[in-house]
Amino acid sequence: MIRWGADVARVAGEVASSNPAATEVASQLDVALVRGGSLTAASGGRKQLRVNGVPRRAAALGAVMRAVVFGPEDMLLVAGSPALRRTTLDELAAAIRPGYAAALATYSRALAQRNRLLRAIREEDAERDELRYWDKPLVEAGGEIVAERLAVLAHLAEPLAQAHAEIAPEEAGAALGLRYETNAPALPGESPRDALARRLAETAEKEVWNGATLVGPHRDDVLFELAGRDLATFASRGQQRTAILALKLAELDLLSAHNGRPPLLLLDDVFSELDPERRGHLVRRIGALPQAFVTTTALGDLDPSLIAIATTWEVRPAADGAQLIGPSQPATRPAARR
């Protein structure tokens, strides 16, 4: 976040790889947020990324450093917009499934063109036969997206249930799961691609009337379920937070298995709304990781057992930006940052 009255926020550091096959042992990473230009609500400015002094696109960051992040905004994952859950699943799929990002880009382009054509048909400025040109790439890419999403969810199932059982052992008998809800369900023996093609044909008239594509992975959803019940409708805030943290830990396990090394775990405001027992279980899980960063505005809000094993840094306002003070409490395994 850019400080009030400033034009730039910048963070830089060295990313070291423990992978012996890595082409570089360490990389210099520099990320800046610049006020003005293409502003985004999330960051307050446009991002500028440099790796070893060379400007890079944000998409290239994954090759340098993988990270799993939990922040206050993630609390919307359970009961918020389906778009948030789709994005979370898409980002994970793109990280572990070759070709997924390309299929997603192809689908997005075909969807935009098809929607434009549907509006033109509604206004009688185009012919319906023209839809076939965009139906093919939409169906091919859309079918691949659904198949890959289902594959990722299948890989997530075991680590998700295990992580939830570790954080909330009192609910060990109620398995946490993710259920994919599609508007183009496949019939017996039907592929996701064929199911999407069939549904597009069934909704053709309605789509022309609405001027938009009404079926496809861009309208699918992922539901959090505990013992088969939708968490969005019955769970407390603490239960929802526990489920989201379990998902983040499951992502960590999945990425670790895929890459051969664990990504960084970044946690912001992680302990609020958790009862003491669940806090303790989460601390034990965090403490077992090679490295994790935990941020808080008040050190007293953190679990004492976490502080005991952490290297603690403090960020204070300064005339020229921010001052980093520490480490004030070195430990054998760094796990917290203030």
Residue ranges and their predicted role:
Residues 4, 107-110, 149:
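Intracellular alpha-helical coupling/juxtamembrane segments of multi-pass membrane proteins
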Residues 92-135, 140, 155, 159:
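Extended, Lys/Glu-rich alpha-helical coiled-coil stalks
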Residues 7, 18-19, 23, 125-264, ...:
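Conserved NTPase motor "head" modules and their coupling/switch loops across ABC/AAA+ ATPases, GTPases
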Residues 68, 263-266, 294:
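Hydrophobic positions in the central parallel beta-sheet of the AAA+
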Residues 268-270:
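Walker B catalytic acidic pair
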Residues 13, 291-297:
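Structural recognition of the conserved hydrophobic beta-strand(s) that form the central parallel beta-sheet
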Residues 2-84, 88-100, 154-162, 192-205:
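Nucleotide-state sensing region of NTPase/ATPase domains
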